[in-house]
Design a protein with these regions (language model features):
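Residue position within the beta-strands of beta-propeller blades
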Residues: 446, 506, 548-549, 608, ...
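Blade-level signature of beta-propeller repeat domains, shared across WD40, Kelch, NHL, RCC1
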Residues: 794-837
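N-terminal signal peptide
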Residues: 10-29, 837
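Short coil/turn segments that connect the beta-strands within blades of beta-propeller domains
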Residues: 440-442, 501-502, 542-544, 603-605, ...
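Immunoglobulin-superfamily
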Residues: 48, 77-79, 94, 131-186, ...
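Repeated scaffold domains used in trafficking and secretory/extracellular systems
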Residues: 433-437, 473-497, 532-543, 581-599, ...
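A short beta-strand motif characteristic of beta-propeller blades
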Residues: 461-487, 523-528, 570-589, 625-633, ...
Length: 837
């Protein structure tokens, strides 16, 4: 019956794979074991002595016949005298009935105790407890797991017949069957508990010791007696051998949880079962438990996932499962609601009787808010008429032929499940008292060869021309000093940024400086020295800093990053270097900082792109220091461009062409875990994301494609629809739709042709605005890949501007047509929109 047990246990008690793990701290008291028979070690040993005496001394056999030596000793014939003497036994018969001696040592049987007492020449008694069984136990975790694995393998061979090798084809069922059978074999008295006596009995019956392994059956009791009661119950056997029966109710396999941004939330895993292993949580197939995340940092004793401060980046799908049992999992769809944030335009306006007035309202939130209007606190809906209408899904109040009684405070109210917001747009109807319309004064600033032009887009009028020779306010420096060898004083500009509609920062790469233009006075007020050849500026609104990328030389041999802090302040400005200098940032080829939006007002992190390196360096914008490296080497992607959506917190990485000219697909990076999730399907090219985060537009010059993907309020990225074009898109601008609330249109300028592409993103409708003259050649604009910029005019802006080689074109976005051309503006490829200051 025990033949198979003998085979495996003699091989060293190799145990099966399990999570039961020996630890030095694990100590368990064991119940007393009373031996059934008290052995005297006399008959066989004395017979051996008589034989030995006969062989050595050649004397009479009966010399030791009547000599009784006691336990642990035997009779021998002295070589000198030939007389029978008692000596310590050379060895005991091999059988395994372990006991503890009063000296604290472990002995394989009673005979060994008495033999040791003889050799040590002091009395050793048998102590009736098993504490010494584990003294000097060297059973390691790996050996213990192997031993248990082999026990299961043996049980499988022993009890599962050839006709039924794989009962039900279910590994969990088969393992449970084997462990049940093993437990029944060990539980000799059928009381539902296995104690040390029964373990000893198994070892004794199989004549197994500890000769071939450092692990024995006693280690089951030592390491897997979870309640420390000195017995092994069937449930403890199940835990020991990882036989776990888990359940997940069918109606809980998919759970939907909704929280409001800024709150904390708990996702609880509904997987149940006795001895359930620890719960593992995944997001986008990335295990969260060991990542030490800032906002997801406490998984609780019950395996729940805690998000301490919910943001829109946390939305998406989460899965939970018991460790080692991935086949049973629960999916949590986590939705994040955001209360509405509202803006109205204009805040105030004056109109003469008989003209048309328009009051517009833009609201964002999750889910999309519903809009309503009040006039002086009363709902205007009952008063709607041909003269007073609501347009664009209620986002615009249109009043034709205004009358004095139309004067009032018009309140736009936005509501969704998370909250409500409102704002007031005031209309004054009065006789020619104010010729200038309140709130109107928005301008394009164009930086070109002959200085700076400030242009009002409606009538295409120049409001100001700052000449190259004009002096900085309060200084002797000129806006564009005449360069040595130049016959004509001219300006060279790279990029420019708007800082809170108060200042414009603009880079002068050939002068190693950044100029500050004061919007209120429309004068240049300061020059900030930078590292050589500053080419790219970005305004980080969250921290009020302007980031400056300088090349060092035109060959980009020593690029650096600098920061101008307190950018909107009135004090004199200066640059500071990012840290650490000379390590992470000194090879910067480009950088990316997400743009703040109506809903997302704080941006914490940005990225540095290094030339020809398949990595992203993450930086903390608050400390301006390196955080970590995200490796893209497995995807063979050298990053060239990035875009970001707060809906699910995804970065889209556009990759450079490889050595064969092939462009790898875009990569997706999860901002919650900083993990690369894989490719964005087969979408390639430069990514752009709409201000509301809902549209991803990818421009693939190689394939001649514009690909549009919609991102849902759950952060799901939908399949792309394609627009084929040979325009070679240079730059892209988003403009809110004038006919549909919560929708956007795009305008794309061409780097080689004279047309601008218009796409209505919701419908896919495409139109071309033609005959806008040729752009600058790429070699005439070395500062970036956008040799023909296109600039929108803000949240409520109707106009866009795009330069050609020597003209400016202002487009009417509401009518989708050319508004006007302004000629004799050469190299005007740096354009900034400034709204109401």
């Amino acid at each position: 019956m025990f033949k198979c047990w003998s085979a495996v246990l003699i091989l060293g008690f190799i145990f099966l794979e399990s999570e039961g793990r020996p630890t030095k701290e694990a100590g368990y008291g064991l119940k007393s074991y009373q031996p059934l028979i008290r052995l005297r070690h006399k008959e066989k040993s004395q017979e051996r002595s008589r034989i030995k005496g006969f062989l050595i001394q050649d004397g009479p056999l009966r010399s030791c016949e009547n000599k009784y030596c006691g336990l642990g000793r035997h009779c021998v014939l002295s070589r000198e005298t030939g007389q029978a003497e008692c000596a310590c036994m050379d060895l005991c018969n091999r059988h395994y009935k372990p006991v503890c001696g009063s000296d604290g040592e472990f002995y394989e049987n009673h005979c060994e105790v008495h033999r040791a007492a003889c050799l040590k020449k002091h009395k050793i008694t048998i102590v009736h407890n098993e504490d010494c069984f584990f003294k000097g136990d060297n059973c390691e975790a790996t050996e213990y797991s192997k031993m248990k694995s082999m026990l299961l393998d043996l049980q499988n061979q022993k009890y599962v017949t050839q006709d039924n090798e794989n009962p039900n084809g279910d590994d969990v069922f088969r393992k449970k069957l084997l462990v049940d059978q093993m437990f029944n074999y060990f539980d000799a008295d059928r009381n539902g508990l296995v104690d040390i006596n029964e373990l000893t009995q198994v070892i004794k019956q199989e004549e197994l010791g500890k000769d071939l392994s450092d692990c024995t059956l006693y280690d089951l009791l030592k390491y897997d007696d979870f309640n420390s009661d000195k017995h092994l119950a069937l449930e403890e056997f199940y835990r020991t051998f990882q036989v776990i029966q888990l359940s997940l109710p069918e109606d809980q396999k998919l759970s939907i949880t909704t929280a409001t941004v800024g709150q904390s939330t708990v996702l609880s895993c509904a997987i149940q079962g006795e001895l359930r292993p620890p719960i593992i949580w995944k997001r986008n197939n990335i295990i969260l438990n060991n990542l030490d995340l800032e906002d997801i940092n406490d998984f609780g004793d019950d395996g729940s996932l805690y998000i301490t401060k919910v943001t829109t980046t946390h939305m998406g799908n989460y899965t939970c499962y018991a460790e080692g049992y991935e086949d049973i999992y629960q999916t949590h769809i986590f939705q994040v609601n955001v209360p509405p944030v509202i803006r109205v335009y204009p805040e105030s306006q004056a109109r003469e009787p008989g003209v048309t007035a328009s009051l517009r309202c833009h609201a964002e939130g999750i889910p999309n808010p519903q809009l309503g209007w009040l006039k002086n606190g009363i709902d205007i809906t009952p008063k709607l008429s041909k003269q007073l209408t609501l347009q664009a899904n209620g986002s615009e109040v249109h009043i034709s032929n205004v009358r004095y009684e139309d004067t009032g405070a018009y309140t736009c109210i936005a509501k969704n499940e998370a909250g409500v917001d409102e704002d007031i747009s005031s209309l004054f109807v009065e006789d020619s008292a104010r010729k200038t319309r309140l709130g109107i004064g928005n301008m394009f600033y164009v930086f070109y060869e002959d200085g700076i032009k400030v242009i009002q887009p409606i009538e295409c009028e120049f409001q100001r021309h700052i000449k190259p020779s004009e002096k900085l306010l309060g200084f002797q420096d000129e806006v564009c000093p005449k360069a040595e060898g130049d016959e004509v004083q001219r300006c060279v500009w790279a990029t420019a940024v708007n800082v809170k509609d108060k200042f414009i920062y603009v880079a002068q790469p050939t002068l190693d400086r950044v100029l500050l233009v004061d919007v209120q006075s429309q004068k240049v007020i300061q020059a900030v020295s930078t590292d050589p050849v500053p080419v790219k500026l970005h305004y980080d609104k969250s921290h009020d800093q302007v980031w400056v990328l300088s090349w060092g030389t035109m060959e980009k041999t020593s690029p650096t990053l600098q920061v101008i802090t307190l950018a909107s302040g009135d004090a004199p400005h200066h640059t500071i270097h990012t840290q650490p200098v000379g390590k992470q940032f000194d090879r910067a080829d480009d950088f990316f900082i997400p743009t703040a939006s109506l809903l997302i007002t704080h941006v914490r992190f940005g990225f540095i792109l290094h030339k020809d390196e398949a990595v992203l360096q993450k930086i903390d914008l608050e400390t301006m220091s390196y955080v970590k490296t995200i490796n893209l080497k497995d995807y063979k992607c050298v990053p060239q461009s990035l875009a970001y959506t707060h809906l699910g917190g995804y970065y889209f990485i556009g990759c450079k062409p490889n050595s064969t000219g092939e462009v790898p697909p875009q990569l997706l990076v999860d901002s919650v875990t900083d993990s690369v999730l894989g490719f964005n399907s087969d979408v390639t090219g430069t990514p752009y994301v709409s201000p509301d985060g809902h549209y991803l537009v990818s421009i693939s010059d190689v394939k001649g494609l514009v690909r549009v993907q919609y991102i849902t309020i759950r952060g799901e990225i939908q399949e792309a629809f394609d627009i084929h074009t040979n325009l070679h898109i240079s730059d892209l601008a988003f403009q809110p739709s004038f006919t549909e609330a919560h929708q956007y249109n795009i305008y794309g300028s061409s780097s080689t042709q004279t047309d601008v592409l218009f796409v209505e993103l919701a419908s896919g409708k495409v139109k071309m605005i033609k005959s806008l003259k040729e752009p600058l050649k790429a070699e005439e604009w070395p500062w970036n890949r956008k040799n023909r910029q296109i600039q929108d005019s803000g949240l409520f802006g109707q106009y866009l501007m795009t330069p050609s080689k020597d003209s400016l074109f202002i487009l009417d976005g509401r009518l989708n047509k050319l508004n006007c051309e302004i000629t004799e503006v050469e190299q005007g490829n740096t354009v900034v929109w400034v709204g109401d200051a």
